[in-house]
Amino acid sequence: MPHLSPMSWITSMLMFWISVSILFSTLWWSNNYLFSSKMTNCAPKSLTPWNWL
């Protein structure tokens, strides 16, 4: 029976976290673009979380 070696487990976890980070960065950039293009005049710029970074 093939068993999952620690190296392949680490590799699968790395691939999982890379895909999750890519997904969240894509959502963050699209949200940033939509917010800055549509709601710039409606909200103070100091309240937007991407200006804190």
Curated annotation (Swiss-Prot):
GO biological process: ATP biosynthetic process; proton transmembrane transport
Transmembrane segments: 9-29
Alphabetical keyword list: ATP synthesis, CF(0), Hydrogen ion transport, Ion transport, Membrane, Mitochondrion, Transmembrane, Transmembrane helix, Transport
A GO cellular component annotation in the UniProt record: proton-transporting ATP synthase complex
Cell location: Mitochondrion membrane
Membrane topology: Single-pass membrane protein
Organism domain of life: Eukaryota
Family of this protein: Belongs to the ATPase protein 8 family.
Subunit annotation: F-type ATPases have 2 components, CF(1) - the catalytic core - and CF(0) - the membrane proton channel.
Role played: Mitochondrial membrane ATP synthase (F(1)F(0) ATP synthase or Complex V) produces ATP from ADP in the presence of a proton gradient across the membrane which is generated by electron transport complexes of the respiratory chain. F-type ATPases consist of two structural domains, F(1) - containing the extramembraneous catalytic core and F(0) - containing the membrane proton channel, linked together by a central stalk and a peripheral stalk. During catalysis, ATP synthesis in the catalytic domain of F(1) is coupled via a rotary mechanism of the central stalk subunits to proton translocation.
Protein name stated in the entry: ATP synthase protein 8
Originating organism: Lumbricus terrestris (Common earthworm)
